[in-house]
Amino acid sequence: MMTSTDLDALMTDLGQRARKAARILALTPSAAKDKALRAAAQAIRIDTKLILAANAKDMEAGEAKGLSKAMLDRLMLNPARVEAMAKGLEDIARLPDPVGRSLAEWTRPNGMSIARIAVPLGVIGIIYESRPNVTADAAALCLKSGNATILRGGSESFHSSQAILTALKGGFTACGLPADAVQMVPTTDRAAVGVMLRLSNYIDVIVPRGGKSLVERVVAESRIPLFQHLEGICHTYVDGSADLEMAKTIVLNAKMRRTGICGATETLLVDRACAGTHLAPLVAMLIDAGCEVRGDAVAQAADARVIPASDADWSTEYLDAIISVGVVDGVGAAVEHINTHGSHHTEAIVAEDSQVAETFLNGCDSAIVLWNASTQFADGGEFGMGAEIGISTGKMHARGPVGVEQLCTFKYVVKGNGQVRPG
């Protein structure tokens, strides 16, 4: 354990170095950033064996620690996932540079021209838990948008993240970018998080990515603005107008494709108007696929294998092969349930009736709403953003997938030819 004085000195040094790097990155040309991202992608490929060996240490420790199946899935790397990280960096390199974009332009009656221009936020602090791929995604998105990054990964993924960081730094510095463009807190001491959240002189925004307890701590303690992602309590509503086969395909994917991601459906709502034809097949499909179903009285009557749902189940992010299933009286009741029990993340409706669908899309107070598509599309890569640094469920500055454009703020550039303000 480090002393509080040592931790303060360590974190302040990281902050000062990040601030210096951010000033360089803000003026780095697009071509140089893209070259560095491609070099980092190649470095990750070259270091695949080292990264997997480091991940094996984390997996062994995680299993010994008794991490859940969902947490272990998030932590686990294999050659395909490492290659996906490398390709993700190359995808980000191909994105348009968000820095320097003219967001709006106008000319005043006195002849002055005014433009609102996108600029980097500066230094972004990212606090995350078990997903080592966040190391690569976050660093790449921040670099592309001209920001320096301070990463604080969880102890579960410490060795994996360090190995990925080494590859990233090698790629960045080989192309002439500052080594401090991306840094990682070099200790697993939880007290480092508290110090990081007080570095308002050096960090411009905090992005927490992890479980409810982590995000709640960050929200409570941070003196720095943050992109908030509390939970992914996502819903799929099957309307009375829904095609059953489409509903089955979407629901199975939304729940079971990957149960441990924030876009996985946690509650299935079925319109009472189609419960007689749709509910039992949907429930049976989920149970047969290995999903535990916790349901209301109607769902229990549809299949004897359904477990009674508690009040808490309707507001639970399972991140596992468990789902709550309930019957509601139409789209209005579905929207009311979602806005009451959800986390404002992602909701989907399966319906053939476009008017009902519009009611749902307009009524759900969530960052992402989908019609006839799986909630697992709640992902920056699937949105064409290259990757995401997280999904913001707040409403200030950024909402939904946070990609390169959302990692910029703006300045006003005013050009005149001698104008002065009259007295």
From Swiss-Prot:
Cell location: Cytoplasm
Enzyme Commission designation: 1.2.1.41
Entry keyword annotation includes NADP: yes
Enzyme class, first EC level, given as a word: oxidoreductase
Cellular component GO terms, alphabetical: cytoplasm
Residues of the signal peptide: none
Pfam entry (one): Aldedh
Keywords carried by this UniProt record: Amino-acid biosynthesis, Cytoplasm, NADP, Oxidoreductase, Proline biosynthesis
SUPFAM superfamilies given in the database record: ALDH-like
Pathway assigned to this chain's UniProt record: Amino-acid biosynthesis; L-proline biosynthesis; L-glutamate 5-semialdehyde from L-glutamate: step 2/2
Any one GO molecular-function label of the UniProt entry: glutamate-5-semialdehyde dehydrogenase activity
Main location: cytoplasm
InterPro entries reported in the protein's UniProt record: Ald_DH/histidinol_DH, Ald_DH_C, Ald_DH_N, Aldehyde_DH_dom, G-glutamylP_reductase_CS, Glu-5-SA_DH, GPR_dom
Biological processes, Gene Ontology terms: L-proline biosynthetic process
Catalytic activity entry: L-glutamate 5-semialdehyde + phosphate + NADP(+) = L-glutamyl 5-phosphate + NADPH + H(+)
Family annotation (HAMAP family): ProA
NCBIfam families: PRK00197.1 (NF001221), proA (TIGR00407)
Family: Belongs to the gamma-glutamyl phosphate reductase family.
Record's function text: Catalyzes the NADPH-dependent reduction of L-glutamate 5-phosphate into L-glutamate 5-semialdehyde and phosphate. The product spontaneously undergoes cyclization to form 1-pyrroline-5-carboxylate.
Name listed for the protein in its UniProt record: Gamma-glutamyl phosphate reductase
Gene name of this polypeptide: proA
